[in-house]
């Protein structure tokens, strides 16, 4: 007789919960994801979304961890005159605290954000370095004791996959040196938070993944207190093939550090055939299952969290921020907050 594992029991429960509906590849359940997942599960939020009680209730129903999508980035916190703005980050942190949700923070240092307060110090040596340290100490220190982790360095590898990005940080502090400093400053500010280096297209682009891994090796040898590896996992049906996620997880886990699937979504592609939406959603579910199974195959101490990049399809950057795919549907919950096949794949696999 086959042993009834937790995962098989959950799968059976999911199937039973769908009785009475039309049987299809799109049969899903509305069971709270966090109630059955054996790893922290999260999504990103924006302050404005949390003002909607229905949104806030749905988020708290399904997720045990949150990441502020925008308001903890430097472009929000650091004003032009050098003052800090913490109103919205504090409100998001308070929502997490009130609802027993883990707070994960992003992002400390990002090539894309050269704010006027730092541009004024460009090329000035010690004043620039002091401002860099003071910013990290102030921001990471503010959420000390609540934040479980930080994306300390974000998206350091260029899109060509072979080079590191150049920025105001590399120009003033050094290509590797600015990252080493950022990790040390963050560790000083919050010794108990897990400190991550985070990047995207690590599944789709093996060359970029290799460059990323060499960078991590150098930083570790230089003494950077890197505590974890973040893979954003912005996947795409046009480019992500079966096996890619599994290979990436195997490589990234080789450091022995905790892994955070930090920003999962799966785009339908540039020109999806919506007449075949059921098939497209099943392909999303298959990729989700592969990624989740690869993650769950890691030792427990390496499974930091599994995060999706948005609560509902209507909240996704794939539609709004990019503006190029207004009908994209890359998340486990649809526009109305109803589960899709991606959700069922997560529920079955993350149950352990």
Predicted regions, residues:
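Acidic-and-aromatic substrate-binding clefts and catalytic sites of carbohydrate-active enzymes
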Residues: 44-53, 74-87, 157-159, 202-211, ...
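Substrate-binding cleft and catalytic face of glycoside hydrolase catalytic domains
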Residues: 67-71, 90-172, 176-194, 200-202, ...
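Short, acidic/polar
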Residues: 48-60, 132-136, 208-218
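N-terminal substrate-binding region of glycoside hydrolase catalytic domains
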Residues: 35-90, 95, 101-102, 108-123
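N-terminal secretory signal peptides and thylakoid transit peptides that target proteins
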Residues: 1-17
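Noncatalytic carbohydrate-binding groove/subsite architecture in carbohydrate-active enzymes
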Residues: 172-258, 262-270
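C-terminal segment of N-terminal export signals and the immediately downstream linker at the start
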Residues: 20-44
